[in-house]
């Protein structure tokens, strides 16, 4: 059963026809702007991966993957949950050099996702990855990339408002970003849950990049789960916006500088995942065979939601919803695709 919120007096800014046009516009403009800003090139992405490679994303380590066998090859395949690890391997395999990177249109199925206004079992995002030097593995470099992404969001929004005057009633986002660590957030709001801390901070400060996600805080608990084998927990984070219709913090992107051999070694042990050391991808990282990189995923439907002022992700993507969600949205005049 999903947990749906119906905002009071909500009306979609665009009709269904214009919504489809706007979605296409957002996806085209943002991808072009992001590529130009970060020096990225589009590559084709897999829909599923062989299970034995270890390239699929384990997310928080408890989500079940969609798995099936392939008759002719006799192998087991998994529908991707994200391409965080695959992209880094692809940078090497495709011959990318320092300062250049790739992006792809990633489509995933997350069967254990808890459905609500922001979460669907269908995930569509721009997955991107870029080769950096070892000297670039620092907060300053990470913050500069975050600012580039936010600038691309704002540029896309400006063009969208020019093409669809109906959207000019919505507030424009600014390129300003506030940076804060998970420990600073816990210190500021010790009596709130992690999600409540995000809501309180982003409501007050606007667009925020929340840094250092994965390792335990002084309370003994991490702010949120993070797989130990792609992001370096010291130089990663979530890009958060304020969702005005839902009055909550809203994650557009999870990203970070990727693990070095040393940080993967440390994080695998911290997470109790030492068994992964035998997998091909993990061996390659631990042996220093893959390039240093930075990367992340940027939600396509989430960006469309943000820029169209939508109240439910089902307004901008076609997915499967429970009967209660469909009935509540129909009653409130929220059209699900």
Feature-to-residue mapping (PLM):
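A glycine-rich phosphate-binding loop feature that marks nucleotide/adenosyl-phosphate handling sites
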Residues: 47-51, 165-172, 323-326
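Class II aminoacyl-tRNA synthetase-like tRNA-binding/catalytic domains
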Residues: 2-119, 127-131
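Generic recognition of stable, solvent-exposed alpha-helical segments in well-folded globular domains
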Residues: 18-25, 29, 137-144, 148, ...
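Extracellular structured ligand-interaction cores
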Residues: 100-102, 123-127, 205-207, 249
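A translation/RNA-centric and nucleic-acid-associated enzymatic feature enriched
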Residues: 109, 180-337
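A generic secondary-structure signal for well-formed alpha-helical elements
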Residues: 30, 34-41, 149-160, 311
């Amino acid at each position: 059963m999903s947990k749906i919120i119906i905002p009071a007096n909500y009306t979609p800014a665009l009709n269904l026809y214009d919504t489809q046009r706007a979605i296409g516009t957002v996806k085209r403009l943002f991808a072009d702007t992001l590529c130009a800003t970060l020096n990225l090139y589009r590559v084709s992405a897999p829909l599923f991966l062989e299970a034995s490679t270890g390239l699929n994303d384990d997310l928080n380590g408890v989500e079940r993957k969609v798995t099936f066998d392939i008759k002719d090859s006799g192998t087991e395949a998994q529908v991707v949950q994200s391409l965080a690890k695959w992209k880094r391997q692809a940078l090497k395999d495709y011959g990318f050099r320092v300062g250049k990177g790739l992006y792809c249109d990633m489509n995933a199925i997350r069967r254990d996702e808890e459905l609500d206004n922001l979460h669907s079992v269908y995930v569509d995002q721009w997955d991107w990855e870029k080769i950096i030097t070892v000297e670039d593995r620092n907060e300053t470099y990470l913050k500069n990339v975050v600012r580039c992404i936010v600038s691309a969001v704002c540029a896309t929004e400006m063009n969208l408002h020019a093409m669809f005057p109906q959207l000019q009633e919505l507030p424009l986002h600014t390129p300003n970003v506030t940076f804060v660590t998970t420990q600073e957030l816990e210190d500021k709001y010790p009596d709130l849950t992690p999600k409540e801390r995000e809501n309180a901070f982003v409501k007050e400060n606007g667009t925020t990049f929340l840094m250092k996600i994965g390792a335990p805080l002084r309370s003994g608990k991490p702010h949120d789960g993070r797989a130990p084998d792609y992001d370096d927990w010291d130089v990663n984070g979530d890009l958060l916006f304020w969702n005005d219709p839902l009055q909550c913090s809203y994650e557009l992107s999870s990203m970070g500088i990727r693990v070095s051999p040393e940080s993967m070694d440390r994080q695998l042990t911290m997470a109790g995942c030492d068994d992964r050391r035998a997998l091909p991808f993990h061996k390659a990282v631990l042996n220093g065979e893959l390039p240093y990189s930075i990367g992340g995923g940027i939600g396509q439907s989430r960006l469309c939601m943000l820029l169209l002022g939508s109240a439910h992700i089902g307004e901008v993507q076609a997915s499967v919803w429970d009967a209660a969600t469909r009935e509540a949205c129909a009653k409130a005049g929220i059209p699900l695709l």
